[in-house]
Amino acid sequence: MGKVAVGATVVCTAAVCAVAVLVVRRRMQSSGKWGRVLAILKAFEEDCATPISKLRQVADAMTVEMHAGLASDGGSKLKMLISYVDNLPSGDEKGLFYALDLGGTNFRVMRVLLGGKQERVVKQEFEEVSIPPHLMTGGSDELFNFIAEALAKFVATECEDFHLPEGRQRELGFTFSFPVKQTSLSSGSLIKWTKGFSIEEAVGQDVVGALNKALERVGLDMRIAALVNDTVGTLAGGRYYNPDVVAAVILGTGTNAAYVERATAIPKWHGLLPKSGEMVINMEWGNFRSSHLPLTEFDHTLDFESLNPGEQILEKIISGMYLGEILRRVLLKMAEDAAFFGDTVPSKLRIPFIIRTPHMSAMHNDTSPDLKIVGSKIKDILEVPTTSLKMRKVVISLCNIIATRGARLSAAGIYGILKKLGRDTTKDEEVQKSVIAMDGGLFEHYTQFSECMESSLKELLGDEASGSVEVTHSNDGSGIGAALLAASHSLYLEDS
């Protein structure tokens, strides 16, 4: 063999070796990066763990905070607000009642005709009205005038089926889903606006007084019988159909719980004890925090960068507003530290809240062999054209970890309420039925979440006690609940 041929062979061999080394190095780098992805996944799973022992600690901490919040204002992270609702609907209510539900950029007006135990809700009608953006930041009178005018127009469409007896004033339940310091069943001052509203002159004002003045200005004769928040409304709606309902929980964009407490168990209540001996407490449980909550680095940074750092910690790990955002933050770390999506981080992945909880739910629910829905969601939301099956499996694992933690902590919260009420065990063979009325898009539409929550609650209660506890969906409880509370606190109860 000549020198040229030998030289060529050596060069070729060297080139092949170089390519082989490069391939091996890339494979090693790739396996190294994949190892980092799996390490991030494993650490996240461990930090989110909710063994039954931890859930019991969370439930016990919830019960302790409930006692503290009932003892004094400011004594707990749980506000434990007195709702002044001491007479929940029983099903006996009769007559025509109205509801106004204001909780965001739309409001609803509703009327219901109640026919007592036999007929229940005979008929109902509602209308949804959008609030023009300029009224959300304008003057208080302008906003309440707009609402009163819409209500007057709705009343004007009342047909003969909705009969109001002679000499009887129309009565309204007002669901107002903004922070309010309630001073009676039908009065409360606005603490602050949320959800894009910013009308400074209304802060500190009695919202019922503001609506009453607007009703007078438009010439509508209507008594506001009850001011309630959406969770108390859900409790009222649940109790109307089932006398065993003891609490209501909303799991939606946000989260909250309300329950029926013995009036004698509320040390901070200084008024006359209600005849019923009961009082509905609005817990504002989204603000619960405890050293027992399994918080991760992602939760801490999400909280730090939020508009209300240090507040609403439970809400930030269990509610629909935040679950998708937690997923985005973990994927971003995988992309930055382990090149999960390749050498460049998808620019869309850096946009906060771009992954919404409905997206996460759709991916988590993907049962196709190649996880096609996961691939298409990642493509549509993050503009990542292709993903491997093992990448999609990681995304599913993350969805499962985040949803499981949220669902199990929700169950621990409910268990804490049942413990406070002494309904977490069966006593002396006595079967005391306890029903929890649930509402909210997260509970209603995220199947894996709601199923995990219910199975975790059963696990906490044990076989015997879980037989006497039931979770039911109280669809749109807050809307009809306000009308039902107007009915149960009507001036005309005797007439009914």
From Swiss-Prot:
* CDD domains in alphabetical order: ASKHA_NBD_HK_plant (cd24020)
Question: Could you say what a knockout of this gene produces?
Answer: Plants display a glucose-insensitive phenotype which allows them to grow on high glucose concentration medium (>6% glucose). Dwarf plants with reduced roots and leaves growth.
Question: Which effect does the record note for changing residue 104 to A?
Answer: Abolishes glucose phosphorylation activity
Region span, Hexokinase large subdomain: 229-476
Hexokinase domain spans which residues? 35-487
Residues crossing the lipid bilayer are 4-24
- What InterPro entries has UniProt attached to this entry? ATPase_NBD, Hexokinase, Hexokinase_BS, Hexokinase_C, Hexokinase_N
Full protein name: Hexokinase-1
Provenance organism: Arabidopsis thaliana (Mouse-ear cress)
Q: What gene, per UniProt, encodes this protein?
A: HXK1
